[in-house]
Amino acid sequence: MSVMVVRKKVTRKWEKLPGRNTFCCDGRVMMARQKGIFYLTLFLILGTCTLFFAFECRYLAVQLSPAIPVFAAMLFLFSMATLLRTSFSDPGVIPRALPDEAAFIEMEIEATNGAVPQGQRPPPRIKNFQINNQIVKLKYCYTCKIFRPPRASHCSICDNCVERFDHHCPWVGNCVGKRNYRYFYLFILSLSLLTIYVFAFNIVYVALKSLKIGFLETLKETPGTVLEVLICFFTLWSVVGLTGFHTFLVALNQTTNEDIKGSWTGKNRVQNPYSHGNIVKNCCEVLCGPLPPSVLDRRGILPLEESGSRPPSTQEASTSLLPQGPAPIDHLSNEMPEDTSTPEEMPPPEPPEPPQEVTEAEK
């Protein structure tokens, strides 16, 4: 007896997630849809470092020290690792409210604010929350249908609410939030060191070659070095400046979004409730604090009803490996109406007839 097993396609949650993100590797990689500038970042880093390792490092390792290419390789690998970690991870996206949850929140808001007359603007949907004796406003997101947590904001590019939203960075192709900010900071810090390192040793390389064949002749023989110097020179100021700005933000335990909006500028005696008043403590919390898990559950499996079929019940899940028999009664409830009438009582059985006596005549 042969048994035919029918396997249905599993639908994972990342396939149905709203927002403007792209997923790769079965939901393990999450990025924004606009990735053109991210590819430019990869091209500039890989191209510049390839030229540096191919030409300058070989000459400098012989003339000066073999440790020069070793340190360059360490900075390059660390920069690439932190870049990919920032670009491919969940920045802290907050799931949107389910239809039932959104309806409940709407009812709660209407009960609190009352009916708004037609033609009048409804009052702002805000909840007050106290953190370290400071009132923080929780704003309602009309797209995600939720009250955003403190420091969260909605990214207009990715169309998602992100926890501790810092900014959307097209150079890494992703939002920068609570779950990938530390990797973003380490990326720009290591990239600054790598840019300074490559730029400095390119100058040393040109100086050493110029002592032997002259400056102009060196420029003619090494066009790749000239290209590296130009790339490093123009990117050095922006990368180093960005690193300094984010170092300032880390020391204050503040985000780029809060700095642009002036949330904690000290006006009206409003101070940053998240700052510990100590640079070391702020740096430890931002860069070394516990990393929260992703709440998206991108690789989770959707129930069958949400992916186009009916979800299995608990009893079906426990007996899915057993041979399938007739459908249970509850599965037929949609086709046959439930009989709610009282069944008629069965009449009691009649007592058996007594045995008849046999007379002498019948014998």
Curated annotation (Swiss-Prot):
Pfam family of the protein (one): DHHC
InterPro entries the UniProt entry points to: Palmitoyltrfase_DHHC, PFA4/ZDH16/20/ERF2-like
EC number: 2.3.1.225
GO molecular function, one term: protein-cysteine S-palmitoyltransferase activity
PROSITE patterns linked to this entry: DHHC
Compartment(s) where it occurs, according to its Swiss-Prot or TrEMBL record: Endoplasmic reticulum membrane; Golgi apparatus membrane
Chief place where the protein resides: endoplasmic reticulum
Gene Ontology cellular component list: endoplasmic reticulum; endoplasmic reticulum membrane; Golgi apparatus; Golgi membrane; palmitoyltransferase complex
Domain of life: Eukaryota
Membrane-spanning intervals of the chain: 36-56, 64-84, 184-204, 229-249
UniProt name for this protein: Palmitoyltransferase ZDHHC9
Region called Disordered, residue ranges: 303-363
The keyword Membrane appears for this protein: yes
Record's bilayer topology term: Multi-pass membrane protein
Pro residues biased stretches: 345-355
Reaction(s) catalysed by this chain's protein: L-cysteinyl-[protein] + hexadecanoyl-CoA = S-hexadecanoyl-L-cysteinyl-[protein] + CoA
Domain notes from UniProt: The DHHC domain is required for palmitoyltransferase activity.
Quaternary structure and interacting proteins, as annotated: Interacts with GOLGA7.
UniProt entry keywords in alphabetical sequence: Acyltransferase, Endoplasmic reticulum, Golgi apparatus, Lipoprotein, Membrane, Palmitate, Transferase, Transmembrane, Transmembrane helix
Location of the active site: C169
